[in-house]
Amino acid sequence: VAMIANRGRIVRPRLVLSRGERSVPVLQRSMPETTSNLTEEDWQKMVAAMEDVVHLGGQGFRRNGTAWAYIGQRIGYRMAGKSGTAQVVEIRQGEEYDEEELSEFSRKHAWFMAFAPVDDPQIALAVLVENGGGGSSVAAPVARKIIDSYLGRSVTMR
């Protein structure tokens, strides 16, 4: 997610072993490395599509962003996100089933990855709620609360 937020540049993480009082250098700053052959236009399209997941609303049934109804309203910054749902047990395509009848551990995993603010990314994250259900309805609100908190915004969602 951070690589998308940085439009193809990745900063290698460093491990901090100590932040004690000793005069030991804590971090050595990494320089971003470009690790992609995508063009700036490609990155802009990808980020715009991820913004729509959160912010595209009022378009009618099945035309809104998948997370708009859950997190895209009353948000004071631009967030880019991607929802996902991972099936845990095999259910054939087109097969009818009642998720409530499945054991809790057979229910779908809810995923949501996001970064914000879009124009100056400061946080990137991925949320997984095991056996939680839909990514937009379950994992996206968790991501929104974390990002709101990180950016110092009050968390007011419906």
What do these predicted ranges mean?
Residues 40-41:
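A structural-propensity feature for long, helix-poor, extended segments
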